[in-house]
């Protein structure tokens, strides 16, 4: 037996080593030719570690490198998955194509099947409910504008005070607080929108979730269903969710009792009630429902408002024309939703900021559910994750001097019959994919637009702003601002 073991063990070692070598060769030199180049592919980068790090630190440069190749599609290894990056010219063709799944592309990347990262419904309902809830909210925005305005004013007075002296403030912290208070007012009503414990959760949940996802994704996929139980960011996230449950579930019970009461009172829209009724008795997680919507809503809106304020500090010549527009519109029409639509210069500044500095550099994610041949003959294999390059936002045929910030750009488009459809902030086009495009375009963009305008209205009417000397206003999140209360004579 000893002799047999002595023979078998080295033999098994040789076989194992050979299998590893063969596997490495297959991974490095896969069978069949790939028609798409991979921008950040490196020899002997067996687990794509170098490629992922390269994307993490130089994503924009890699994307630009891919666009400079002249190919209409190329692969890009990211820190999540490898995407087939398509130029925006394909967006119109793919936007409503059912062969490409939106949720199928996003859910695995966001790890929605893991506890603490999960969705609120079992099965397909978890992807149906958030858009339905937000669309229902959109119908109520005309009634919610005064309440949202009140919360914006309250938050600014609390954080920026009524002092007429110049003083430093943190724009990222202010904007996050504003979006948390206003969005909570829209979704959950007046009871929770000034609840400090809930607002702390609302402000930090999206970041905490992203940290937890990154921690899990740093491990091999076959270990992820187990390792998340032991990772500190995931454990902290689950504790935060439990704190949220202690707030949301009692609030839901109060809403149910009020809705079922015999008193025929007119109640404001409540996201809690809408989702509860939409579920029709199906088992669901009311807390995760709200946290999921918050996770989506906060990022885009807060990113936009921060960058617009940064642009105003970098281009102070825009502040007075914007202020005059607000004074004229609000003076003649009041601060209502229909009057917000008349703020065309403000919309132009917002959209131009978003054009040059979108929240993400690639977007409109899809997964090919089957092999798809596009109209120009490009073949997208089944199972391919695709994303769009946002390249048309720099198209000189679409935008004159596209690299230059022009706050009046989209306002002028309203005077051009050929381009008037491009002007509205909430309009999606293949040349402006910040909110996606087609049937999966972001349904929350209307709330985001209203919140951003209300915040800017209150800032322009009540404060003067300027960048702190030496700070880079083009970098939201890393710069501070000086702010002073406007006096009555200004």
Swiss-Prot record:
Sequence positions that bind heme: 442
Q: Which GO terms describe its cellular component?
A: membrane
Q: How does it sit in the membrane?
A: Single-pass membrane protein
| PROSITE patterns attached to this UniProt entry | CYTOCHROME_P450
Pathway(s) per entry: Mycotoxin biosynthesis
UniProt main location, coarse: membrane
GO MF terms on file? heme binding; iron ion binding; monooxygenase activity; oxidoreductase activity, acting on paired donors, with incorporation or reduction of molecular oxygen
Pfam families found in the cross-reference section: p450
Query: Which GO annotations describe the biological process of this protein?
Result: verruculogen biosynthetic process
- What compartments host this protein? Membrane
Sum up the protein's function in the record's words.
Cytochrome P450 monooxygenase; part of the gene cluster that mediates the biosynthesis of fumitremorgins, indole alkaloids that carry not only intriguing chemical structures, but also interesting biological and pharmacological activities. The biosynthesis of fumitremorgin-type alkaloids begins by condensation of the two amino acids L-tryptophan and L-proline to brevianamide F, catalyzed by the non-ribosomal peptide synthetase ftmA. Brevianamide F is then prenylated by the prenyltransferase ftmPT1/ftmB in the presence of dimethylallyl diphosphate, resulting in the formation of tryprostatin B.
Provide the family line: Belongs to the cytochrome P450 family.
Q: Which PANTHER family match?
A: CYTOCHROME P450 (PTHR46206), P450, PUTATIVE (EUROFUNG)-RELATED (PTHR46206:SF3)
What is the protein's name according to its record? Fumitremorgin C monooxygenase
Say which species the protein is native to.
Aspergillus fumigatus (strain ATCC MYA-4609 / CBS 101355 / FGSC A1100 / Af293) (Neosartorya fumigata)
